[in-house]
Structure formats: structure tokens, C-alpha cells
UniProtKB/Swiss-Prot annotation:
InterPro entries: DNA_mismatch_repair_MutH, DNA_rep_MutH/RE_typeII_Sau3AI, DNA_rep_MutH/T2_RE_sf, Restrct_endonuc-II-like
Function summary: Sequence-specific endonuclease that cleaves unmethylated GATC sequences. It is involved in DNA mismatch repair.
Entry keyword ATP-binding: no
Any GO molecular function: endonuclease activity
Keywords, alphabetical: Cytoplasm, DNA damage, DNA repair, Endonuclease, Hydrolase, Nuclease
Protein's name in the database: DNA mismatch repair protein MutH
GO BP terms: DNA modification; mismatch repair
Subcellular location(s) of the protein: Cytoplasm
Disulfide bonds: none
Similarity annotation: Belongs to the MutH family.
GO cellular component terms listed in the entry, alphabetical order: cytoplasm
Keyword Phosphoprotein in record: no
Gene source species: Salmonella typhimurium (strain LT2 / SGSC1412 / ATCC 700720)
TM stretches of this protein: none
Amino acid sequence: MSALCPLLTPPASEALLLAQARQLSGYTLGELAAMAGITTPKDLKRDKGWIGVLLEIWLGASAGSKPEQDFAALGVELKTIPVDSLGRPLETTFVCVAPLTGNSGVTWETSHVRHKLKRVLWVPVEGDRSIPLAERRVGSPLLWSPSEEEDRQLRLDWEELMDMIVLGQVERITARHGEVLQLRPKAANARALTEAIGARGEPILTLPRGFYLKKNFTQALLARHFLLQNP
């Protein structure tokens, strides 16, 4: 049996990607970091994206911070998702930055959100803060595409939120808007402002916004998958 090691090049097929992801299941983050020659931070306060970066290394992801999917040749996006002991998501899932200007003619079919969610490799990771970061285990992966109903739910929320952005109501949007998709500020500090449209159509400066999947949406898709896998 060959020793487990990170993929040095992007996987050539979904089957190879999923096979590698399945091999990581059951390992701790500390074990995977040590095998990849990476130091595990004490916590994620200063390294919020560390788990994602670690798994990108193991799975041969190519995109880095570019707007395309993590596995561009396969059209697959990687999403790590922290879960509790019952496999329920502990936080919302970032999808992409929301465009606050230049949105004339944009449709759900051509949107960045839909592009990012077209095909996703979900990798659950233990997220209970009582477990030291190095001891948190990686779970069983799921390769997912939205069903017709999921696509409909996402589209309705996206259209409502984009209508508000275009009509100059971005600052009235709260995390409560949307059934499965929400829009909320995404900035490392409150001084990082970006241009948007105000209530009277004038240019304004506001915090950058990001689209996030709500926990009810990711919980339902994970529950369906793992119930199917473990009847």
C-alpha cells in the first residue's frame, strides 16, 4: 500500500479527487500538517483559513485566491465545513464576495455564486473549540451539486439580495434576509470600504459584502448525504 502524501499536481478527475479526500478521513489536522511539513497553529484566531489551505495542499488545489474554482480543470470548489459531534455545521459557509456595482444585466445563471456552487467538494472537520486544533479530525467528504430545489432556493435569495443592492438598499440588508443565502459584511477591519450604490442612486462607500450559505442549508445537505451513506 502506498504511503499517504499530498497531491503535487491537480487531480485529473473527480474520482481521483474524491479518492484522495476519502483517504484523509479520520486523520487529525496535526497529523496531516506534520506529513505535509507544515506547522499547526495553536488556534485559528490569526489563521482563519489555515484548515482550507492545509486541505488544498493535500488535494492538489490550483486556484489559490483566484476567482475560479479551486479545481478549475474539474469545475469543483473545495469547502471545508466545521461540524459538531453530531455532524451539524457550526457556522455559515462563505461563497464569494458580492459585487456592489456594475450589476446591470447580471442573472442567476451567470452569477459568481452559482458558478462557485455548481460542484462542491464538502469536507467536514471537527470544529468543537474544546478540541485542540491539532487533534481535530477530518470527516468523510461529499461531492455535491445543487438539486433543482436547492438551485431554486438559492436563486430566489440571490435575486432578492441583488435587487436590494441594485436599488441602493445594501445598507438595509441584514443577515436575516434570505432563507438559505445571506449577505453580510466581509472585511478584516472597518476601514476597508468599497464603492456601492446609495438609496438615491449616488455612489457611497460601504463595507465589502460576502455571500454566505446559512447553516440550515448546509445542515440539510450533509444530513441527507450521511443518512444515505449510513442507512
